[in-house]
């Protein structure tokens, strides 16, 4: 169901991740709100806004309007594309009060970034994955990490050590993960 066809009884559809951050427009007609950038720190806030809005009796548009005020959230229905007569993209008709630019949300890497479900029934079942770093400063033209998540950030050593200790308690090998390691 396209976003414009959803009713008050339909869920608010949210998307995120690298593809949504890099180019959300191919999905804009189907998604109510995109989390642009890294979503771990935004998801609970976004869900709180939706829950609180529903509890207050706000309609779908009012909730989406509140989401648009969150830095790192893009609500496509509030940015209507405008085209020239020849079909060339001209710009957007932006709802008043909505940010003209959507800024990517970056995490400081102080929590999360580890295996959540530790089971042997997955591809890396014997391993406890720990994210060491995000972003990349090399800016290779072929790589999404260099453009989409440009700012290189390294998780603090004490947090990495805590992750290794959790892996040891579970009897798992440690796998280190990052875009540029």
PLM-predicted stretches and their roles:
Residues 1-94:
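Glycine-rich beta-alpha loop elements in corrinoid/cobalamin-binding modules
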Residues 4, 54, 90, 100-103, ...:
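Context-gated lysine
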Residues 5-9, 47, 100-105, 115, ...:
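N-terminal start-of-chain detector that recognizes signal peptides
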Residues 9-12, 48-51, 104-108, 152, ...:
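Short linear motifs at secondary-structure transitions and domain/linker junctions
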Residues 12-13, 43-46, 70-75, 80, ...:
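Extended aliphatic helical segments
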Residues 15, 19-22, 58-63, 67, ...:
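Short, flexible coil/linker segments at or flanking structured domains
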Residues 76, 82-129:
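N-terminal [4Fe-4S]-dependent radical SAM core
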Residues 110-181:
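Radical SAM [4Fe-4S] cluster-binding motif and immediate context
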């Amino acid at each position: 169901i396209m976003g414009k066809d959803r009713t008050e009884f339909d869920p608010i559809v949210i998307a995120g991740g690298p593809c949504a951050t890099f180019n959300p427009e191919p999905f804009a007609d189907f998604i109510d709100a995109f989390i642009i950038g890294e979503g771990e720190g935004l998801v609970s806030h976004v869900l709180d806004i939706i829950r609180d809005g529903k509890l207050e009796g706000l309609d779908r548009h009012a909730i989406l309007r509140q989401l648009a005020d969150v830095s790192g959230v893009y609500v496509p229905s509030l940015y209507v594309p405008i085209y020239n007569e020849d079909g060339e993209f001209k710009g957007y008709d932006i709802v008043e009060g909505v940010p003209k630019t959507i800024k990517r949300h970056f995490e400081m890497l102080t929590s999360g970034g580890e295996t959540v479900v530790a089971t042997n029934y997955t591809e890396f079942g014997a391993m406890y994955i720990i994210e060491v770093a995000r972003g990349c400063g090399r800016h290779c033209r072929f790589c999404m990490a260099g453009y989409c998540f440009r700012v290189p950030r390294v998780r603090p050593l004490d947090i990495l050590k805590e992750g290794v200790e959790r892996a040891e308690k579970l009897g798992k090998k440690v796998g280190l993960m990052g875009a540029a390691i």
